[in-house]
A protein has these predicted regions:
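Class I SAM-dependent transferase core
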Residues: 148-172, 177-178
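Short amphipathic alpha-helical segments
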Residues: 243-244, 302-305, 360-362
Length: 370
């Protein structure tokens, strides 16, 4: 990137995450016909390479995060034009132009692209980065600490942490994990534990828990337990980071939901897909363990919730000022009470103010005691 005079680390990191998503999907679903890579000047073009990447990205977002990405592939155009009648030519072209103008985003633009010359400059950068990773396998059947550490390095350098968005250090995640009676919980449950982090950020808690399972379970048992790990993240970029991170650590089965964990269950489970991926995954009283470091002191967060969502909380009442209330940590506590079953455990990092403030904090303490 420095060679090509690209200094925007955050944008570069975002694009790198998208590239990793493409490669992870390709390795998982196209093992016998890999599409990730540049196949040489005699067999490929920059446009075709990016077309394949966009297709992989669309499929990866649908499969891993339940998100629908607008992308018009060469196959889509070929299929429609084969059936085209002259009188519909204008309408079809208008629809394609509308999608490309208003609904698509260049998910692989390390440089700003708004003409052919800039497209070719960016394509050269993209080709070189794709070639860097094409011959390496990102998805593993077992933990690959090197790949995990590599991605952690990219994360620390490429994503700025500021007020309200701090990643939980791995050491803190491990300390909390060691404090839990995990072996006892596993032995008491005949089925895999359903585990959730409802503010998963970059996925540190999820990956630490998944790694800790290796102390108690066989390789055959691990995959089933991974399938019962859920992370919810409201920030779009971080939801993608969490999915890539889990794959890098060899834990690709972990479920990441791009959603607002405080929304009503119907809204939190909504996505643009049909069938199996659209089925609700977060239900009340359905989890055995919650581990999280949710945000705190977020002014006006209630304004982002629908009336239906707000009314699912006992803490919400007419006396609360929706515009100024910042007690988001209290609502995360009540949400924990809603999604955990009667025998569940919760390990949540909270500000000390939850122990001594009055008003809504007093009501939150009552929920915790109950």
């Amino acid at each position: 990137l420095r060679k090509h005079n690209i200094s925007g680390k955050e944008n570069a990191f975002d694009k790198l995450v998208n590239i990793f998503l493409c490669k992870i999907y390709d390795e998982t679903f196209n093992k016998n016909n890999l599409k990730f890579g540049y196949f040489g000047v005699m067999a490929d073009t920059y446009a075709n390479m990016q077309d394949r990447l966009m297709w992989l990205y669309k499929e990866a977002m649908k499969e891993f995060l339940g998100e629908k990405i607008t992308f018009v592939s060469n196959e889509d155009i070929e299929k429609d034009f084969k059936q085209l009648k002259i009188k519909t030519l204008k309408e079809v072209m208008q629809n394609y132009i509308k999608e490309l103008k208003f609904y698509s985003n260049n998910d692989f633009a390390f440089l700003e692209v708004h003409n052919k010359e800039l497209f070719l400059k960016n394509a050269l950068v993209l080709k070189e980065i794709v070639e860097l990773f094409a011959n390496y396998k990102l998805t593993q059947n077992s933990t690959n600490q090197f790949l995990g550490n590599l991605f952690e390095l990219f994360l620390q350098k490429g994503m700025k942490q500021d007020e309200g968005q701090f990643f939980t250090p791995i050491q803190i995640c491990e300390f909390i994990m060691y404090s839990l009676p995990l072996q006892e919980m596993l032995s008491k449950n005949s089925k895999a534990l359903r585990v959730i982090d409802y503010a998963c950020g970059a996925g540190h808690f999820l990956n630490t828990y998944a790694n800790e399972l290796k102390r108690y379970l066989t390789e055959d048992e691990l995959k089933e337990h991974y399938k019962n790990i859920y992370g919810i993240e409201k920030e779009y970029r971080l939801s993608k980071v969490s999915k890539v991170s889990s794959a890098m650590y060899g834990q690709n089965e972990i479920n990441i939901l791009y959603a607002d964990a405080l929304a009503s269950f119907e809204l939190a489970n909504t996505n643009n897909l049909e069938g199996e991926k659209a089925k609700p995954q977060i239900e009340s009283n359905s989890f055995d363990l919650l581990i999280a470091n949710p945000p705190y002191s977020v002014k006006g967060f209630l304004e982002t919730l629908s009336d239906k969502s707000k009314n699912t909380y006992k803490l919400f009442n007419d006396d609360i000022n929706i515009e100024t209330n910042n007690s988001i940590e209290c609502f995360f506590c009540e949400r924990a009470n809603q999604i955990l079953n009667d025998n569940a455990k919760a390990a949540i990092i909270l500000p000390s103010s939850i122990l001594n403030k009055d008003s809504i904090y007093k009501n939150t303490r009552e929920i915790l005691f109950q």
